[in-house]
């Protein structure tokens, strides 16, 4: 679809509201203003005007704002009409504008896409707009604003610039091998490369924090029936999210709760008790439980402390441990400490975390919250931090891998050509984050996830 068309969309959420905004972007924005307003508003000044239909009747009245390109959000001529937020009024106004020649409805994210294509935003900043809208906590919102203002992009540009300087030295060493100073063997390039690798690792650490803030952690509570899984879900959620009874198999389906621990989003999933199913409904619930377990970031293995003294997971339930993915982190939760009299606390058992608590009374729940936060490496002090997506983490990981391979080529064989290629590939991976090197397919996937009017 053409990016030279003039586009229009509602920039406020659908439904009733105090204010409804229509946004127009493109070369025909001034023609829309003349047709609907009767004049072109003074640039960047709010003008209170009637919004006219084709026959001259007034559809609504409100604020009109005109931003000539390139000094606008999209870099094109932009007109905003801010009227009353009734859906009927907005639909009538939208139909009025679409009746004009050369106008069409914007695709999801097309305003932000045009801002990116016109160099008003880089790709990381454009993504931050969607992240700010979707932020589920104050900390996530603040980090999204930092990304929108260029905090993440600035770190990436610093790394790219450092790699550019490093490539200059390497290319010089390759092109002028007979010079008195051999840059490849005198340690200068290795020292600079080590510095870039250290800086990249710091950015990766901050990006992992940003990814946790954005996407959160998926924790699945699993175990036998009546181990206290639903009670634990309620204790973590701080409300009666799940029905709790003494009847084994009360939970038949997956229950989900979304909470925050010091700003970190946590997706808690309560599952059906794992056992040989008594009927088809329970069998489906248990199958769904295993599907959730296999996709978890961490499993809370819930154990009824009144039924066993074992603390080693394989000794508690060998069949359960045998089916778990080998790389999946687990925390053994020995429940019902209020009955067994066990000392509350967190310990390590053969490399596994074990916590003793009472889901019914809430004793030990704060210890579990701290453990979940620490197990993901999350720190609540992220002043100046930024949000990151999975694709950002993948690009950073790829760049780090190329730098490690380049370092190996340098120290083992002084292979300048191979080092130069690894540096180029690392730089290319970093540039994918800001969109300086991105395929059209990637851009399409990113912007299609945005709101219509963004």
Swiss-Prot record:
<keyword id="KW-0547">Nucleotide-binding</keyword>
<dbReference type="InterPro" id="IPR027266">
    <property type="entry name" value="TrmE/GcvT_dom1"/>
</dbReference>
<dbReference type="InterPro" id="IPR006073">
    <property type="entry name" value="GTP-bd"/>
</dbReference>
<feature type="binding site">
    <location>
        <position position="80"/>
    </location>
    <ligand>
        <name>(6S)-5-formyl-5,6,7,8-tetrahydrofolate</name>
    </ligand>
</feature>
<feature type="domain" description="TrmE-type G">
    <location>
        <begin position="216"/>
        <end position="377"/>
    </location>
</feature>
<feature type="binding site">
    <location>
        <position position="250"/>
    </location>
    <ligand>
        <name>K(+)</name>
    </ligand>
</feature>
<dbReference type="GO" id="GO:0003924">
    <property type="term" value="F:GTPase activity"/>
</dbReference>
<dbReference type="InterPro" id="IPR004520">
    <property type="entry name" value="GTPase_MnmE"/>
</dbReference>
<dbReference type="InterPro" id="IPR018948">
    <property type="entry name" value="GTP-bd_TrmE_N"/>
</dbReference>
<keyword id="KW-0342">GTP-binding</keyword>
<keyword id="KW-0378">Hydrolase</keyword>
<dbReference type="GO" id="GO:0005829">
    <property type="term" value="C:cytosol"/>
</dbReference>
<feature type="binding site">
    <location>
        <position position="245"/>
    </location>
    <ligand>
        <name>K(+)</name>
    </ligand>
</feature>
<feature type="binding site">
    <location>
        <position position="226"/>
    </location>
    <ligand>
        <name>K(+)</name>
    </ligand>
</feature>
<feature type="binding site">
    <location>
        <position position="454"/>
    </location>
    <ligand>
        <name>(6S)-5-formyl-5,6,7,8-tetrahydrofolate</name>
    </ligand>
</feature>
<feature type="binding site">
    <location>
        <position position="251"/>
    </location>
    <ligand>
        <name>Mg(2+)</name>
    </ligand>
</feature>
<dbReference type="Pfam" id="PF01926">
    <property type="entry name" value="MMR_HSR1"/>
</dbReference>
<keyword id="KW-0630">Potassium</keyword>
<dbReference type="InterPro" id="IPR027417">
    <property type="entry name" value="P-loop_NTPase"/>
</dbReference>
<dbReference type="GO" id="GO:0030488">
    <property type="term" value="P:tRNA methylation"/>
</dbReference>
<feature type="binding site">
    <location>
        <position position="23"/>
    </location>
    <ligand>
        <name>(6S)-5-formyl-5,6,7,8-tetrahydrofolate</name>
    </ligand>
</feature>
<dbReference type="InterPro" id="IPR031168">
    <property type="entry name" value="G_TrmE"/>
</dbReference>
<feature type="binding site">
    <location>
        <begin position="226"/>
        <end position="231"/>
    </location>
    <ligand>
        <name>GTP</name>
    </ligand>
</feature>
<dbReference type="Pfam" id="PF12631">
    <property type="entry name" value="MnmE_helical"/>
</dbReference>
<protein>
    <recommendedName>
        <fullName>tRNA modification GTPase MnmE</fullName>
        <ecNumber>3.6.-.-</ecNumber>
    </recommendedName>
</protein>
<dbReference type="InterPro" id="IPR027368">
    <property type="entry name" value="MnmE_dom2"/>
</dbReference>
<feature type="binding site">
    <location>
        <begin position="335"/>
        <end position="338"/>
    </location>
    <ligand>
        <name>GTP</name>
    </ligand>
</feature>
<dbReference type="GO" id="GO:0005525">
    <property type="term" value="F:GTP binding"/>
</dbReference>
<dbReference type="Pfam" id="PF10396">
    <property type="entry name" value="TrmE_N"/>
</dbReference>
<comment type="subunit">
    <text>Homodimer. Heterotetramer of two MnmE and two MnmG subunits.</text>
</comment>
<comment type="similarity">
    <text>Belongs to the TRAFAC class TrmE-Era-EngA-EngB-Septin-like GTPase superfamily. TrmE GTPase family.</text>
</comment>
<keyword id="KW-0819">tRNA processing</keyword>
<feature type="binding site">
    <location>
        <position position="247"/>
    </location>
    <ligand>
        <name>K(+)</name>
    </ligand>
</feature>
<keyword id="KW-0479">Metal-binding</keyword>
<feature type="binding site">
    <location>
        <position position="120"/>
    </location>
    <ligand>
        <name>(6S)-5-formyl-5,6,7,8-tetrahydrofolate</name>
    </ligand>
</feature>
<keyword id="KW-0460">Magnesium</keyword>
<feature type="binding site">
    <location>
        <position position="230"/>
    </location>
    <ligand>
        <name>Mg(2+)</name>
    </ligand>
</feature>
<keyword id="KW-0963">Cytoplasm</keyword>
<comment type="function">
    <text>Exhibits a very high intrinsic GTPase hydrolysis rate. Involved in the addition of a carboxymethylaminomethyl (cmnm) group at the wobble position (U34) of certain tRNAs, forming tRNA-cmnm(5)s(2)U34.</text>
</comment>
<dbReference type="GO" id="GO:0046872">
    <property type="term" value="F:metal ion binding"/>
</dbReference>
<dbReference type="InterPro" id="IPR005225">
    <property type="entry name" value="Small_GTP-bd"/>
</dbReference>
<feature type="binding site">
    <location>
        <begin position="245"/>
        <end position="251"/>
    </location>
    <ligand>
        <name>GTP</name>
    </ligand>
</feature>
């Amino acid at each position: 679809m053409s990016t030279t068309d003039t586009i229009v969309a509602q920039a406020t959420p659908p439904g009733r509201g105090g204010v409804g905004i229509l946004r127009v972007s493109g070369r025909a924005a001034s023609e829309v203003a003349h047709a609907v307003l009767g004049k072109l508003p003074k640039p960047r000044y709010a003008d209170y005007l009637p919004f006219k239909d084709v026959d001259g009747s007034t559809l609504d009245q409100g604020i009109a704002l005109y931003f000539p390109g390139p000094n606008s959000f999209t870099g094109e001529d932009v007109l905003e009409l801010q009227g009353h937020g009734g859906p009927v009024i907005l639909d009538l106004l939208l139909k009025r504008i679409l009746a004009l020649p050369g106008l069409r409805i914007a695709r999801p994210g097309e305003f932000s896409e045009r801002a990116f294509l016109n160099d008003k935003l880089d790709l990381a900043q454009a993504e931050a707009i969607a992240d700010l809208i979707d932020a589920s906590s104050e900390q996530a919102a603040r980090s999204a604003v930092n990304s929108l203002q260029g905090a993440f992009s600035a770190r990436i540009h610093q790394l790219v610039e450092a790699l550019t300087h490093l490539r200059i030295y390497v290319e010089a060493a390759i092109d002028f091998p007979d010079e008195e100073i051999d840059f490849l063997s005198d340690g200068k390039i290795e020292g600079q490369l080590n510095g870039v690798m250290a800086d990249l690792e710091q950015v990766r650490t901050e990006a992992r924090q940003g990814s946790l803030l954005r996407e959160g952690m998926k924790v699945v509570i699993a175990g036998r029936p009546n181990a206290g899984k639903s009670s634990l879900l309620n204790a973590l959620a701080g409300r009666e999210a799940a029905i709790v009874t003494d009847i084994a198999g009360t939970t038949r389906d997956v229950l989900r709760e979304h909470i925050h621990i010091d700003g970190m989003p946590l997706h808690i999933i309560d599952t059906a008790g794992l056992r040989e199913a008594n009927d088809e409904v329970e069998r489906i619930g248990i199958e769904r439980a295993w599907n959730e377990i296999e996709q978890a970031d961490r499993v809370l293995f819930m154990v009824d402390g009144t039924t066993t003294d074992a603390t080693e997971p394989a000794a508690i339930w060998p069949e359960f441990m045998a089916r778990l993915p080998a790389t999946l982190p687990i925390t053994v939760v020995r429940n019902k400490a209020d009955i067994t009299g066990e000392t509350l606390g967190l310990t390590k058992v053969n490399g596994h975390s074990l916590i003793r608590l009472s889901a019914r009374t809430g004793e030990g729940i704060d210890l579990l919250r701290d453990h979940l936060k620490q197990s993901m490496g999350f720190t609540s002090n992220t002043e100046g931090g930024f949000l990151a997506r999975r694709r950002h983490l993948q690009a950073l990981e790829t760049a780090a891998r190329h730098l490690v391979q380049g370092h190996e080529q340098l120290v083992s064989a002084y292979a300048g050509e191979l080092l130069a290629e690894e540096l180029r590939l690392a730089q290319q991976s970093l540039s994918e984050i800001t969109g300086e090197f991105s395929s059209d397919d990637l851009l399409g996937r990113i912007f299609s996830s945005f709101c219509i009017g963004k």
